[in-house]
Amino acid sequence: MARRCEVCNKGVSHGHNVSHAENKTKRTWSPNVQTVRAVVDGRVKRITVCTRCLRSGKVQRAI
């Protein structure tokens, strides 16, 4: 599953783990995306959506 929201296009962000000695190693932050059944253009479709879009009501979930 792609770690990208199909509504807001939020994806993986990159950065560093920083130790107390200021050593840096690469790491990634993944968005909290979930596969939900949603109404898209009047039809029920399975899409990948981040939880922020779910909470803000940008997606109408199918029953």
From Swiss-Prot:
Signal peptide feature range: none
Q: Which GO terms describe its cellular component?
A: ribonucleoprotein complex; ribosome
Going by the UniProt record, its keywords in alphabetical order are:
Ribonucleoprotein, Ribosomal protein
Q: Name one GO molecular function term.
A: structural constituent of ribosome
PANTHER family in the record, alphabetically?
Answer: 50S RIBOSOMAL PROTEIN L28, LARGE RIBOSOMAL SUBUNIT PROTEIN BL28A
Family in the record: Belongs to the bacterial ribosomal protein bL28 family.
Protein name (Swiss-Prot/TrEMBL): Large ribosomal subunit protein bL28
Species whose genome carries this gene: Symbiobacterium thermophilum (strain DSM 24528 / JCM 14929 / IAM 14863 / T)
